[in-house]
Amino acid sequence: MLFRSARRSPGDFEGVRSVAATVERPTVAALARTVQDDLDAAAEALAGARRSRIHVFIATSPVHMERKLGLEPSEVLRQARGAVAYAAERVDEVEFSCEDATRSDPEFVARVCRAAIEAGAAVVNLPDTVGWAMPHEYAGFLAEVRRRCPELRRVVLSAHCHDDLGLAVANSLAAVQVGAGQVECTVNGIGERAGNASLEEIAVALKLKRDYFDAETRIETEHIAAASRLVSRLTGYVVQPNKAVVGANAFAHEAGIHQDGMLKDERTYQIIDPKDVGVRMTLPLGKHSGRHAFARACADLGMKLTPDELNAAFRRFKALADTSGAVPVEDVFVEVTA
């Protein structure tokens, strides 16, 4: 779990402290700059955690070092080493991130990673902070940094991707392919700007493609839909209907050809078992629906129709659906009995 932690944000501080005192199995992490006040606040907030982690970060790209931090690379290197060592004395483990890694020089990133590992970092995170990389570029970047810094093989390599180009999940999965043991993601993909990699999409992809990725998680995916709804309600961020895995339409089949196939065998148009993510498959009725789905809806409503009655009712339904789009199932009963 990742939270911003600094004294200038009392709400974040209390949030971290509350989570740390409540959860039992997960490692609780607080995010901190390479600033002693941040590090002290993070350690204090994590005091009640069963297992605590401070996540230290500093930018390594030229534009960030020059324009945002006003620091020379040598000073960035010094701060990274010092902050990790300081944090390692106060919590169970330390994670270190090179902010804006994908726009950084791989050789410099390797040097900073080596310094962080030598100072005590157990997890090293190489973020695509602005969603700049393509999947093959991100995988290649991680592999190149690890080639230049063999010490990375002694720690957990982590991926953190943003969705500015809609590639956060693809990039995260590409990272898993080249050995990332941790992927940072969020429920519903919420996050800065266009968001972060979507937890539900990554979890289900790794579950379905376990042999392909040779990786697995301990996520209980049957609770994913409930978690998505809870996060949506608490944040006010509406989940788009066509969102993969958790969108309202993710397991809804309206097209007649698809509905016919689904009624015969759900594997025809569905690669994810809805029960695996805590939802049900639906066959909504609309102008693209076919006779088989309509007949199924009538049967589900307890109506017993002769072939002629079914044909007449289906014609009335299609006329209604052609003008109104989706047709609630209760309206089918009205149309049939009219």
What are these regions (language model features)?
Residues 5-8, 31-34, 58-61, 99-101, ...:
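Short, ordered loop/turn segments at secondary-structure junctions
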Residues 14-23, 36-157, 173-180:
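Alpha/beta enzyme core
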Residues 20-27, 46, 50, 54, ...:
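Structural signal for hydrophobic packing residues in well-ordered secondary-structure cores
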Residues 50-51, 167-183, 190-208, 250-273:
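Flexible glycine/proline-rich, aromatic-decorated loop/lid segments
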Residues 136, 143-149, 173-174, 193-204, ...:
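Metal-centered catalytic cores of metalloenzymes
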Residues 157-164, 171, 185:
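Histidine-centered catalytic micro-motifs
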Residues 204, 210-338:
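A mid-to-C-terminal "edge-of-domain" accessory segment
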